[in-house]
């Protein structure tokens, strides 16, 4: 099992799919990492040699990922909440931020229905 950026990658998957299990790496970035590391994207992770894994580690290390990225996102949200701007208030109340309707729908963001007491 290959370990990159503190994440164990599933050995039966292709490299570009396996890299997507790292927080902060999606489809596009995964392919860019493979190209930069000179690794074929359809190679299975179990078939990678140690030098190839090391090249992938170096390329992945150039990006903000995993814990650092989670911290950055959390701090950006906290900053909005501290500013008392509209987006910060919506975050604080657990409502949608980007103008979606809330009279109906928005159940994912608002959570389960609360019964109205009569």
From Swiss-Prot:
A GO molecular-function annotation: tRNA binding
Region (Disordered): 95-118
InterPro entries the record matches: Rbsml_uS13_C, Ribosomal_uS13, Ribosomal_uS13-like_H2TH, Ribosomal_uS13_bac-type, Ribosomal_uS13_CS
Disulfide bond sites: none
Gene3D superfamilies: 1.10.8.50, 30s ribosomal protein s13, domain 2
GO biological process, one term: translation
A Pfam family of this chain: Ribosomal_S13
UniProt GO cellular component terms: cytosol; small ribosomal subunit
Keywords assigned by UniProt, alphabetized: Ribonucleoprotein, Ribosomal protein, RNA-binding, rRNA-binding, tRNA-binding
Highest taxon of the lineage: Bacteria
Quaternary assembly: Part of the 30S ribosomal subunit. Forms a loose heterodimer with protein S19. Forms two bridges to the 50S subunit in the 70S ribosome.
PANTHER family tied to this protein: 30S RIBOSOMAL PROTEIN S13/40S RIBOSOMAL PROTEIN S18 (PTHR10871), SMALL RIBOSOMAL SUBUNIT PROTEIN US13M (PTHR10871:SF1)
Job description of the protein: Located at the top of the head of the 30S subunit, it contacts several helices of the 16S rRNA. In the 70S ribosome it contacts the 23S rRNA (bridge B1a) and protein L5 of the 50S subunit (bridge B1b), connecting the 2 subunits; these bridges are implicated in subunit movement. Contacts the tRNAs in the A and P-sites.
Family classification: Belongs to the universal ribosomal protein uS13 family.
HAMAP family: Ribosomal_uS13 (MF_01315)
Protein name: Small ribosomal subunit protein uS13
Source organism: Xylella fastidiosa (strain 9a5c)
């Amino acid at each position: 099992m290959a370990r990159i950026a503190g994440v164990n990658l599933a050995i039966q998957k292709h490299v570009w799919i396996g890299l997507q299990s790292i927080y902060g790496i999606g489809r596009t970035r995964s392919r860019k990492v493979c190209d930069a590391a000179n690794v074929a994207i359809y190679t299975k992770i179990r078939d990678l040699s140690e030098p190839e894994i090391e090249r992938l580690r170096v390329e992945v290390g150039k990006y903000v990922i995993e814990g650092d990225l989670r911290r950055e996102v959390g701090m950006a949200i906290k900053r909005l909440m501290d500013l008392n701007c509209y987006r910060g208030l919506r975050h604080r109340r657990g409502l949608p931020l980007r103008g979606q309707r809330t009279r109906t729908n928005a159940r994912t963001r608002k959570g389960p229905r609360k019964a109205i007491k009569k």
